[in-house]
């Protein structure tokens, strides 16, 4: 699939229409405009950041990195936090992700393991993971980070 080529995804046209700004390619001004609209929201920041209809492409892992880099808490209401550095953190993490994937891609070509790399990358993206169920308000520690579940 080439960037911008949605033909293989024609089954998902209705879902694609409802996606927000693409985090990986969205302009800083677009991202800033969206984040500015959250300023008075009483929703938790993590919920807005992971809402694919607002900004698409940010999952739990990248969302965690973005919030950590910005020094923001996912469990607090958006209106109770200073979001001034959020977009810069989004762009910083985005560039870091692109750089790492490019590096891994180039290494795989040099080592003649392109097929293996693509298969591992695809499996990581779509791997079926077991999920634990936690009660609302419970706390989960993962790799030194605390997650408050709502």
Q: What name fits each language-model region?
A:
Residues 1-72, 80-88, 143, 149:
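Phosphate/anion-contacting hairpin/loop surfaces
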Residues 95-150:
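C-terminal accessory segment of soluble enzyme catalytic cores
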Residues 77-100:
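Charge-dense polyanion-binding interfaces
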Residues 41-45, 56, 93-104:
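Short secondary-structure junctions and interdomain/linker hinges
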